[in-house]
Amino acid sequence: MGIHGLAKLIADVAPSAIRENDIKSYFGRKVAIDASMSIYQFLIAVRQGAEVLQNEEGETTSHLMGMFYRTIRMVENGIKPVYVFDGKPPQLKSGELAKRTERRSEAEKHLQEAQEAGEEANIEKFSKRLVKVTQQHTDECKKLLMLMGIPYVEAPGEAEASCATLVKAGKVYAAATEDMDCLTFGSPVLMRHLTASEAKKLPIQEFHLNRVLQDLGLTWEQFVDLCILLGCDYCESIRGIGPKRAVELIKQHKTIEEIIQHIDTKKYPLPENWLHKEAQKLFLEPDVINPDDVELKWTEPNEEELVQFMCGEKQFNEERIRNGVKRLSKSRQGSTQGRLDDFFKVTGSITSAKRKEPETKGSAKKKAKTNSATAKFKKGK
């Protein structure tokens, strides 16, 4: 879910924080991409009618086609993508995950009814609501990225939080995800619609946290409290308090704790066992990768192993895959003359750490610690 209604609220009260750009304007930029969100989008969008793409064995392949071609499109436009995969979800998210399971169960019932009635539109709608990213989808996308020469990292917790950390440390220009809580985790720049279908013709939206805070007149900590009031994945919100009222209350009382002391709790009853303090801590001090240990490398695609995996195992058309590899190699050669501040260094390993501010610009350039083993990006053989 992310943060309920945050994008609209920013558009209404802090419109100067949003910029719209064409994908070509990001030539030479490194971008950290929320991998799970991208895979979810591919499973929904890359379809034949209501059905996901499958090979002859009945294995889903929509995620691989989406990841392959959308990544090539980014590279052709000079973007250097870095995919960030989710780790273990925080305990606070268990309630939200349970709700999602319940919604999928409800969608399954509606799908069965639609199939019995032959309602094609509803069949497609409810089929998409059943989509869930599995470990197999994730593992296959990691293998694909490795063979394409595209770096990825594995976050210890929420991918959005580690994406935000990479932006704050200067490792990448922006975090790309549809989840607005990446701003709540402190990402200076958030990009939406980067991995959207080209056919949708959606401009890429940039949200700039410093302008959001400036226009709202809030500190980051107050912004976190505002996001909790709007509704997040980690705790309930106060029923009856909408976005504009939430902004007014934060501006007037500064903290959720003070708001609780002053609002009429009969009119605005607090959630039972409200875990707002735990949610605050999770946003302000999430479990993230240590940016000092992150070194990224963009390498040549391994054409033969890509063909073996995508065509031999997953039964994609060999000519199309080879053409895709040629496009990728050609684009990589053309993008070496990018922005001066944007070049991938040697590969390294990633360690889990609580988020911390980089002490100096130089600290983000330290060599990767080879004894860290949480996650690694490896070059294809």
From Swiss-Prot:
Cofactor binding remark: Binds 2 magnesium ions per subunit. They probably participate in the reaction catalyzed by the enzyme. May bind an additional third magnesium ion after substrate binding.
A GO BP annotation: DNA replication, removal of RNA primer
Cross-referenced Gene3D superfamilies: 5' to 3' exonuclease, C-terminal subdomain, 5'-nuclease
Listed cofactors: Mg(2+)
Signal peptide feature range: none
Keywords: DNA damage, DNA repair, DNA replication, Endonuclease, Exonuclease, Hydrolase, Magnesium, Metal-binding, Mitochondrion, Nuclease, Nucleus, Phosphoprotein
Family: Belongs to the XPG/RAD2 endonuclease family. FEN1 subfamily.
Protein name: Flap endonuclease 1
Source organism of the structure: Gallus gallus (Chicken)
Species lineage: Eukaryota, Metazoa, Chordata, Craniata, Vertebrata
